[in-house]
Amino acid sequence: TVSKEDKEKTIGCTGIYYANSMIPQGELELEKIVHSFAAKKFLNSYLLKEGVKEEKLNEELLKVVDIRYGKPYEDETTKKCDEFIFKLISGSKDEIKKIAESGIY
């Protein structure tokens, strides 16, 4: 089971990935956009499995997106989320990579 704190941090990171995935392609390398899409998709499923209600999740994600929308990509913030998620959820790095490579977001 994931602690409440880790769950909240995961939701925060999911929101960051979501916001990143909305950055126009000309402003950010496609690879980073695709990684963010894949991470958002993976974490969405993960959080629902962990018992987060879909409505609450969407609400929380939109809060993060509202704050970050239109702001430039933050490498440091995204890297910290990657590290946190890869450590928290075993196999997540490979799963996210698989989603990114499958081209299905």
Feature roles, as predicted:
Residues 2-51:
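Short N-proximal segments of mature Sec-exported proteins
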Residues 30-105:
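Compact alpha-helical subdomains of small soluble proteins
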Residues 1-2, 96:
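A broad "ordered helical/assembly scaffold" signature
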